[in-house]
């Protein structure tokens, strides 16, 4: 979410490549599957980090891979962790779906005018770092590579045995978690979860490709544009692809209505997903952007030609279905962290740092 280094000299947003791209597998010479060996470092405002939290929950890996949550405020030194003296962390919080952060259970954001950027409420603003007492995410980057020169991004998948970063690319991390690497440590119900079924792999890959470039990254291309011409081009493109997504989901919903009848909404929603008739990686990758759209991207990134809730009925139905019916999505979504993280951490976009109260509710009832 850092601003300055993310833009090139043509006023266009260019995302930095992730430099750490190892995998975990029984055949890997170093990084082999083990319970308790790996740790996930995230920040809840970040949509890329949320992908990994969702996958960790869906695959039953929360007890296997611990998690620490950075403070929601990203300053010029990067993400930071709370100090242990700010409270007491029970070990079980590290293996919770959202790292023990309490406000994920609220389903709404709270007024934040009286919350300073240096707020230090343990398990509210973030968690401590339990292994080394590190105060900054950057410490992990320098521990792995002392001459590291890049940005300090989340998520980070860390190896406690070798004290190195395994991977800091969210798409790789969800692939590692979705592989069979950790199957021996989870129950059969989680072994059966395959977010990229072989029969749908080509469809999911194609869907993910344009969703990433035009929607996931599209909001950033618009929000971090440094001239009006680039902004207008990127916003127009973004909404063209939201239209494409709406049409895709409309066809899916209409087909399900024809199969089950318009009044049989429970059966329709049981199979109403982006690709196929079960949850897949397509839903995992799409959700973090859509759940943030009305709450921050519409106003903060000026993606304001339309809202999801009022102008994209099929996407909105999909969003509510995913959020309210699937704990892995709901309990990794913290609207207060999301709103604070964007509006307080990007002064070029929002110089005064005022966090809008609306829209309310952050997500509408099912």
UniProtKB/Swiss-Prot annotation:
Family to which this protein belongs: Belongs to the GST superfamily. Omega family.
Which BP terms from GO are recorded?
Answer: glutathione metabolic process
Please write the reaction equations for the catalytic activity of this protein: RX + glutathione = an S-substituted glutathione + a halide anion + H(+)
Give all residue intervals belonging to the GST C-terminal domain.
197-349
Function text:
Active as '1-Cys' thiol transferase against beta-hydroxyethyl disulfide (HED), as dehydroascorbate reductase and as dimethylarsinic acid reductase, while not active against the standard GST substrate 1-chloro-2,4-dinitrobenzene (CDNB).
Task: Give the GO cellular component terms, alphabetically.
Answer: cytoplasm
Instruction: Return the protein name.
Output: Glutathione S-transferase omega-like 3
Q: Which GO terms describe its molecular function?
A: glutathione transferase activity
Q: Where in the cell is it found?
A: Cytoplasm
Induction note: Up-regulated by tert-butyl hydroperoxide (t-BOOH) in an MSN2/4-dependent manner.
């Amino acid at each position: 979410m850092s601003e300055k280094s993310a833009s090139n000299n043509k006023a266009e947003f260019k995302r930095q490549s992730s430099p750490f791209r190892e995998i975990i597998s029984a055949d890997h010479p170093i990084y082999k599957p083990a319970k308790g060996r790996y740790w996930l470092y995230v920040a809840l405002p970040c949509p890329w980090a949320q992908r990994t939290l969702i996958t960790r929950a869906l695959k039953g890996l929360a007890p296997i891979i611990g998690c620490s949550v950075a403070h929601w405020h990203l300053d010029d030194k990067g993400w930071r962790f709370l100090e242990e003296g700010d409270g007491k962390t029970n070990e079980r919080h590290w293996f919770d779906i959202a790292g023990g952060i309490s406000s994920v259970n609220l389903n709404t954001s709270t007024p934040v005018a009286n919350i300073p950027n240096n707020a230090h409420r343990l398990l509210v603003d973030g968690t401590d770092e339990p292994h080394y007492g590190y105060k900054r995410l950057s410490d992990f980057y320098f521990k792995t590579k002392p001459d590291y020169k890049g940005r300090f991004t989340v998520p980070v998948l860390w190896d406690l045995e070798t004290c190195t970063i395994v991977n800091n690319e969210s798409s790789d991390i969800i692939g590692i978690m979705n592989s069979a690497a950790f199957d021996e440590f989870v129950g059969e119900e989680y072994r059966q979860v395959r977010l990229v079924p072989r029969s749908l792999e080509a469809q999911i890959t194609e869907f993910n490709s344009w969703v990433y470039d035009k929607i996931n990254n599209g909001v950033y291309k618009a929000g971090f544009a440094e001239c009006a011409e680039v902004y207008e081009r990127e916003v127009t493109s973004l909404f063209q692809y939201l239209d494409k997504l709406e049409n895709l989901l409309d066809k899916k919903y209409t087909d399900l209505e024809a199969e089950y009848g318009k009044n049989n909404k429970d059966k329709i929603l049981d199979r109403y997903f982006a690709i196929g008739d079960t949850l897949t990686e397509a839903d995992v990758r799409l959700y973090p952007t859509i759940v943030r759209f009305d709450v921050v991207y519409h106003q903060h990134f000026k993606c304001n030609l339309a809202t999801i809730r009022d102008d994209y009925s099929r996407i909105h139905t999909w969003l509510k279905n995913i959020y309210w019916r699937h704990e892995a999505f709901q309990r990794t979504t913290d609207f207060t962290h999301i709103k604070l993280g964007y509006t307080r951490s990007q002064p070029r976009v929002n110089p005064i740092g005022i966090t809008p109260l609306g829209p309310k509710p952050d997500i509408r009832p099912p």
